[in-house]
C-alpha cells in the first residue's frame, strides 16, 4: 500500500529516529495516534502480528525519542510487539510486505536494519543478550546505553530470571522494560503512582540514595534500617520486591500509554548506573476495540476488514492437524483418566482449547517454560500417569537436555506431540520445524513416527500413547489434513513401514506428509512408493528389500537432510554394505526464510514438480 501523507501528516515527518527526535514533545501524542491507525491499516491489508504492536506504540515512540538509537542499543524480546519499531526505523513504506516472501522479516532481524540489534523470534532471550552488549560497551569505554523490552509472558521463562540474577551480580548499566499487558491499567497506575515513579527515577532521589549509602556504610545497623525503610516505602505502592532482590532498581508500574510521562521517566532513568527495571502497564490491542476485548484472537491476524470488527471465518473445509490432535486427545482422555496434557503457552495453536475446558484438572499450561514442561511430564510418568507434551517443533529445541536426561535415559513413557514440523510459512527462520528428526533420531530407544495423513496421525498418537518402554514422538505439520477416512484406533507395529505402490527400478521411501506429492512422482516415474512411517526404529528389512529389488532409492522428508530420516537410511545401507545409489530429498543446509508453505516448498523442490525434476537430474 502506498503511504497516505494527508491521512498521516505527523507520521509522514518521521522516516528515521533522527527525524523523530526533531519533533516537539507536544506532537508525540498525535504521532502515536497516527502510528496506531497506520498499523491497523497496514496489517489488516497484509496479515501479521497485530494486538501486541498496538499495545507498544507509546513505548516505542518514547524509547526512540529518549535514546540515541541506533547508537544506543534497543533489544526487543520475541518481536511480536516490534511493528511500530520497524515503522519508525526506515521501514514504514514496506510494512505491508511483512511476513511475505521477500518482504520484511516478521521479527527484528539483524540483516534487515542496524536498528535490529538482536534477531529474535523465540522468547526470553533479550536480557541475556542485553547484558553481553552492555558489558562490551563498558569495556570499550563507549557511552552506549542498552535497553531490553520484554513482555509479561516472556519474563516468566527461566532464562530471563537467570539473566537478571547475573545482572544483579555484575551490575552492568542497562535498562529492562517490562511490558505488562496481562491486565488493563490498574488503579494504582494513576497520577500518584506515575508521580512516584518519576520521583524515584529522578536524579535528586538517586543522589540522596547513593549518598546515604556511602555515609552510613560504616554503620551497619543504620544502613540496614535505611534499606528496609526504602523497601517498605516502595513495597506499599509497587510490586517490585522480586526485581529489587535480584539487584535491579525497580521503578513502576507506570502507564505505558502516557507517552509524555514515559519520556520523563526514561530521561530520568537513562543516566542511572547499574541494572534498572521499568515496569509499564499496557493494554494489548490498544486503540482497536475488538482487539482489546479479544487479544488472543487478534494476536496474529489474516487479512481482514477493520470496520467489521471481526476476522474472516475459515471456509469450514478440512480440519487442521492441530485439530486432529485435539480431537484425539479429548477422545482418549474420556476413556483414560490417567492422561495428562501439557503445553508451554500454546493452548490455541496446539488445538487444546476444547481439552482444557472438558478436562481442566488434567490440562497444564506451564507458560513459556519448555524445560519445565518436559521434566514435569517426567515426574507425572514416574507417578504412574500418562503425560503428553504438545509442543511446536521449534520450541522443543529449547528443552533438549530435558528430553535426554529427564525422560529418555530413564525410559519414561512420555509422548511428544510435535506440531508445526517442517516448513511453517510466514514466521520464517526462527520458527521452521526443520530439525526435530535430526535432534531426536540420535537419542537411544526413542520411537519417532511421521504420519502421511490425518488417519495415520491418529493411529500413531494412539500407538505412542500405549508405548510403555520409553518416550515416543509423533511429528505433524502446520496446516490442513488431506481428507482421508478416519478408521478405528489401533496400535501400529513398531518400526514397520508399508508399500503403497509397486513400480520398477526406483523406490521412493517417504517419511511424513509430503506423501501426496511423492505419490504423484511415483506414478509419473513408475516408481515403488513406501510409507516408512517410523524414523526410529527404521524398518531395516524393508529398506534392504527395496535396495535388493531396485536400482536406486530416493528418500523424502520435510526435515533437514543432515541427520534426518534419509541419513538413517544411508546408515542402514552402509552398515549392510549395500552399494545402491540413494538420493536424499529434504530441507537444505541453510535456515529457511519466510514465505507461504506452498511458496517455500516449490522454491526448495519439495512439491511434486520439484521432486521429479531433482530425481530426473540425479538419474541423468
UniProtKB/Swiss-Prot annotation:
Pathway(s) it belongs to: Metabolic intermediate biosynthesis; 1-deoxy-D-xylulose 5-phosphate biosynthesis; 1-deoxy-D-xylulose 5-phosphate from D-glyceraldehyde 3-phosphate and pyruvate: step 1/1
Uppermost EC category: transferase
Enzyme Commission code: 2.2.1.7
GO function term, MF aspect, one: 1-deoxy-D-xylulose-5-phosphate synthase activity
Binding-site residues, Mg(2+): 152, 181
One Gene Ontology term from the biological process aspect of the record: isopentenyl diphosphate biosynthetic process, methylerythritol 4-phosphate pathway
Co-factor note (free text): Binds 1 Mg(2+) ion per subunit.
Keyword Magnesium recorded: yes
HAMAP family per the UniProt record, alphabetical: DXP_synth
Similarity remark: Belongs to the transketolase family. DXPS subfamily.
Protein name, per record: 1-deoxy-D-xylulose-5-phosphate synthase
Gene source species: Shigella sonnei (strain Ss046)
Gene name of the encoded protein: dxs
